[in-house]
Amino acid sequence: MKSSQTRKNKRSNNKTRKHKTLKPYKGDTIIMFKPNRKAIEIANQDVVKYLFREKVNVDKAIKQHQGFKQILKQQGQKFVDISEYIAKDTPSEQLANLLYTRDPFIRTPKGLVLGNMKEPARKHDREIIEAIMKKFHQPIIYKCNEDEKLEGGDYLINCNTSFLGTGARSNMNAAKKLLKLGLYGTEKVVIIFPVKPEESMYRIHLDCIFSPFGCKQCVIWDDLTHKNSIHKRMAIEYTLQNNGTYKRSCKAKNFIDYLKDNNYNIITLSSQSQHNYGANILELDNGKVLVQDVETHKKIKGSIFVPFHEIHKMYGGLHCSTNSFVS
């Protein structure tokens, strides 16, 4: 069977490659950044400028983040707090949003791609993260150009499929550049876009409304399942070819239809759950799923609840607050 398939592949560059199913990044290190007291105190003076929903109780935020770390320890999950690796002369105001380590870069099976933050309040995040990645000897395979907006909360990976959301923070320029350069490293790439501009801070990134876990399981905001929703997302699939390039493999379709067509087990979440970052789940190396919302906790069997409501005031959740690199 294998030799026959190989011969068939050699005869046509238009046929897709066959790959082993990619598993989540097992045995790697989660990177985190504990809430910085001085930075949050500065941000509390102008919550709009620093992208907060409202003023944050620093002590509560630090306590909840510490509780998050404790759960990671209990689950045997490796992690590192990068706060001790920050240059000491870094201005505190540049650290207000760095707690959300997810956004400055994405990690694909090919390596680390440094993004390009859209909001001025986060323009320093990339250079700070880049310096830290160098300290950990992590190679950067690409840095997005100025016209290529890319934030890590818009990138998700599951079962050899990359999902990249575009819209409020990441754009098509970045999505297509990674396609052109072959940097996704998965058999399929699904680029997702809204039918109407989306600016709500509750939905700025893909991981705020959708997250896959396990293999072909996912949680998704219920509103996205309605065909006439003004928040509807569309999806275009690209498939890896024998020559290493990606070719569009389907017409744009409703994202929820794409998930159904690809046999995803779909768990829908209410708007209240979505506002509580119910879709912003974090899957650990051991397969356990961490959640921060009661509804999601009930719907994902065996999930672990992590109190995180104070940090939600900064417009982010558990997945937003982590990223990873090769140990």
Question: What function would you assign to each model-found segment?
Answer:
Residues 1-17, 21:
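Arg/Lys-rich, intrinsically disordered low-complexity tails that mediate electrostatic binding
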Residues 15-327:
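The feature marks the mature, well-folded catalytic cores of soluble enzymes
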